[in-house]
Amino acid sequence: MAKEYSTISRIYGPLMIVEGVKGVAYGEVVEIETEWGEKRKGQVLDARENLAIVQVFEGTRDLDIKTTRVRFTGETLKVPVSMDMLGRIFNGIGKPIDGGPEIIPEDRRDVHGAPLNPVARAYPRDFIQTGISAIDGMNTLVRGQKLPIFSGSGLPHNKLAAQIARQAKVLGEEESFAVVFAAMGITYEEANFFKKSFEETGAIERAVLFLNLADDPAIERIITPRMALTVAEYLAFDYDMHVLVILTDMTNYCEALREISAAREEVPGRRGYPGYMYTDLATIYERAGRVRGKKGSITQMPILTMPDDDITHPIPDLTGYITEGQIVLSRDLHRRGIYPPIDVLPSLSRLMKDGIGKGRTREDHPQLAQQLYAAYAEGRSLRDLVAVVGEEALSETDKKYLEFADRFEREFVAQGYDEDRSIEETLDLGWELLAILPETELKRVKKEMIMKYHPKYRGRSS
């Protein structure tokens, strides 16, 4: 039952303290009305004996302690869901901003989702093609996985996110694939880039966009990824769709978490972030996966910018504990004009082995990826040696490794923003590059694979 109070004792930042309340619960939705009739929404952050701390989504600017009324609805925050959300753009709290009509909901779902019994989870399997060789070939994305992208300020992670959202597909099941894209704390320029990218390429038809701008209240950023994941769960488990959820930028999310924690005067943890940030991030990342008996799946690609390119910073550090690998963008590759600047050596997809190989991508994929990785690592190591002793000191084989490393970056890692490579094109390109090396150096690939896929022998009858 709804209860109304006008006993606000304090307003600071996005928070207000309401005293003399009874029967108020954590997470309860609050309706706030000013003396001139303006209505805002909020949520209970903390409920104690006779007071409640409320976070106001639209901010507390111009709210008067004496005349503002607060109504506790007794309900949790819910998002209206419908298949009509595909092709639409919303703000951070689910209101349409594309000029289209309001969504007529088929249902209303709690933004925090329902706890998923670990026993009910199915193991992530099957390949998702992003059309980007450095990911598909070397750090494969698997259906149901959570694979973050670790970027840095000024690197083209937004461009990469838009390309993945446009190109990603489940092979043979394109009609059941959708993208839910949530951007947090982005500028108007970035928001316009995403809108334009989705609309001009037609990717908007199979996508749902949530855009939280930098000048929107910080508290809204806490809700945005949960809104997106609630819609993703609806599409995946009610309509058996394979949903890719892209969240950018999780660093902005964590900054909002720190800002609200400071406003609540909580004891800070590492670098001022709240001590519960690991648990909070887990409530987002752990909503990826597959459920036994359900055809649909949720795959997550959170994107975060590492402050000062520091991979040990609390945000990437804690993210790495929860997720299943990472795609690392390199400032050095970016400076040399290579897009996407994915550094395959520190990058890792822990579930890659379960989504590739015969019947999923191609039988040679696991061995080819290992050989490419080993050869590129050797080439990178020799680059450092050349800087000390010069190229004249290298053997002919060493020079081949140097050539391989250079061409691997220019031809395999680098590709156009509009270039969508199939997995077959990616793997064949890998073999073309391995042909630079003597066959005796291909120690991680079985002889029968060399005879079948190496350019020297390809096309010959067995």
From Swiss-Prot:
GO MF entry, a single one: proton-transporting ATP synthase activity, rotational mechanism
Membrane-protein topology: Peripheral membrane protein
GO biological processes: proton motive force-driven plasma membrane ATP synthesis
Record localization: Cell membrane
Stated family: Belongs to the ATPase alpha/beta chains family.
Function: Component of the A-type ATP synthase that produces ATP from ADP in the presence of a proton gradient across the membrane. The B chain is a regulatory subunit.
PANTHER family tied to this protein: V-TYPE PROTON ATPASE SUBUNIT B
Protein's name according to its UniProt entry: A-type ATP synthase subunit B
Protein source organism: Pyrococcus furiosus (strain ATCC 43587 / DSM 3638 / JCM 8422 / Vc1)
